[in-house]
Amino acid sequence: MVEGKGFLVSSVTELHRKEKQKKKGKSGGFESLNLGPNVFNAIKKKGYKVPTPIQRKTMPLILSGVDVVAMARTGSGKTAAFLIPMLEKLKQHVPQGGVRALILSPTRDLAEQTLKFTKELGKFTDLRVSLLVGGDSMEDQFEELTKGPDVIIATPGRLMHLLSEVDDMTLRTVEYVVFDEADSLFGMGFAEQLHQILTQLSENRQTLLFSATLPSALAEFAKAGLREPQLVRLDVENKISPDLKLSFLTVRPEEKYSALLYLVREHISSDQQTLIFVSTKHHVEFVNSLFKLENIEPSVCYGDMDQDARKIHVSRFRARKTMLLIVTDIAARGIDIPLLDNVINWDFPPRPKIFVHRVGRAARAGRTGCAYSFVTPEDMPYMLDLHLFLSKPVRPAPTEDEVLKNMEEVMTKTSQAIDSGVTVYGRFPQKTIDLIFNRTREMIDSSAELDSLERTSTKAFRLYSKTKPSPSKESIRRAKDLPREGLHPIFRSIIETGELEAMSFFQKIKNFRPKQTILEAEGEVAKSKHVKGPAGQWVDVMKKKRAIHEEIINTRHQQNQKTSNNHLEMEAEPTTSFVDGTVEGSKVSGKKRKAQETFKDDEFFISSIPVNHHSEAGLSLRGNEGFGSNRLDAAVLDLVADDGQGIKQQQSNYHWDKKGKKYIKLNNGDRVTASGKIKTESGAKATAKKTGIYKRWQERSHKKVSRDSGDADETTRMSGRGGRDGKRRQGSVPNAHVRSEIKDLDQVRKERQQKANKVSYLQSKRGGRGGRGGARGGRGGGARGGRGGSRDFGGGGRDFGSSSDRGGRSGGRDFGGRRGGASTSSRGGKRGGGRGGGGKRGRGR
């Protein structure tokens, strides 16, 4: 009975425990994933309570072992979505287990950010993580590999370099592979590196692809070796955070610096952190110098920057010691600023994907943020392409005349449109910009450094513009028909009614176009002065003709306006009006007007273009060149480089190898110097083949990277012979690094040879420095005649003279005579010893 009662109690306890687990599972927290205590405690320590939508969708799939391709907007928690399952799968360090997880990142900064996050989530585990990125010492990375890491976080270029240098390094044990920012990795920029890395991975691996911009067509990722992958795409409609406010500000190219100073000084609060994107590193240097003259201390970051300097600048910005960070696209795709308030696109991004990655830095984790984009007249087509990609309508801000007619009604309608998701673009306050522009121009002209930097940045931007993808033809056409914009709504609060009237008056002066030609004006003057001639008659004829033509033009204009309004009302979606390209008040040609008047049955009409065509085209890897261009055969990076040299190097180059008599394909950013060396992206020169740096480090440190990546204290010591035939692995012993006293055959032979050479040298030193004699006699004694000897044994060779057919040049003072040594031959040399005595010319030394 007791046993039965105990069994009953244990069953009830087990039942209660299972019920508690079910309740926790229904809560939607991390408890429902049944994570181990080490990982779960680290998550709680980090402060996470509920998974984000992308984590809730992907983590159960990853834990089940299937391949996953996931897309979610920037700042949605994608990094934790693949790190938490990785830590749960690996659990703990396995000696002699090799590398079990590999995370590839396109940039060094993103890899460092992932490493920091991995250490925080894996703080309660003993897993070993190594970072392999460019810019760091190769010897230090060899040392990291000898410690037997379980997880490697790397960039493709450096990992490929290490694989080529270290023969014993293998990735066959990798069972968990993550491609972070997969669209950049699988773009044409890293094709060669990834091809070599993927060939060394095991086929029995789990592959994960994560990015903020991924296409739905997984055929573009065939290189990754996906096996029945699960596609998870969140926020496809809202590619940017709904808490992010977008402001598009039109400006002339020469006024962009003035507009930036005004925005930073007057509009953005001094306690808010702002990220400023520019096109090239030359613009970074110019804007940085300009800000310093204005007593503004920014931080900078660009691709060619030294790694240590980059870390210092970014860390100062993260510590809020500086409130501005000026960056390029190349450098910024890994910088994670958790509390960023504003993003300024000083140069409008040429691709919608780049815009999403830029503005995604702000408004993270439930915070609000603002994104300001400067739009020049040349950038208007790119802005329209962007809104096609975002599926958002766009309209100009109301003009000053419209605001003055009914300010309250116009402002209310504009605010309602912005709240409903419509993008409103407008101008800066021109009067304020003009004042700042004049002062900025004086500063640049008075400073030789600023003037030089401005000219350099202008040339760099000209080259940058040549490499930009072109917008779609439809957007170019629509941009020409867009009506004039007014002052942007964000500046309404600082503009008074009197200033609005002045701005309206100035705008009317700018838009004034006289109706009369110069000939008519002269005719009017002649008519007023009562000058006789045909001029007055011409004026009357032109007035009658213009009156008739104006009536016809106004009638046709009203008809076109009615047709355009009816067409816009028939459209179901607000963005389709931009696809058709009709703008209210625009003139339409006959063919286009006829096409607009055709009836389209909403019930039976099937469009040849998908509804999400523009969105998928912008996400596609093949669409990296933009909406308006075809795919190029040349390998072009997703991001345009930030300097002129980098722009030229973004195409794959081939170098003729004279020794191998074949072409060698160089990686992007590499070039061959006159000495046959490759100059890598970091600026370091390296030979085209294996450099041997690993072997030199191996000889110096007496360590090695074993094929199974064992522990450093057990397998990396290379003491003497290392056991029988090098197969028996011994533990750490005292003085294991000391060189063995047992010499092998080569060492004994080398030592004997050195000893024999030493004896020979000493003998020759004693007998007159050796001999160059022989068949022709030397200068002194020795077996073959030497150059000369000592005073007593100068000719001390065979028979105390020269044993050659020709006597030596000089002998000693006692044995050979002063004027020549004795010759044992019947023929005495002319310069050596004679037949019986001294030579004719030989003179003893």
From Swiss-Prot:
Motif placement: DEAD box: 180-183
GO molecular function: ATP binding; ATP hydrolysis activity; mRNA binding; RNA helicase activity
Chain segments carrying region Disordered: 675-845
Feature: compositional bias, Basic and acidic residues: 696-716, 738-754, 806-817
Enzyme type, top EC level: hydrolase
The reaction(s) this protein catalyses: ATP + H2O = ADP + phosphate + H(+)
Intrachain disulfide bonds: none
Domain characteristics, as noted in the entry: The Q motif is unique to and characteristic of the DEAD box family of RNA helicases and controls ATP binding and hydrolysis.
Protein name: Putative DEAD-box ATP-dependent RNA helicase 29
Gene: RH29
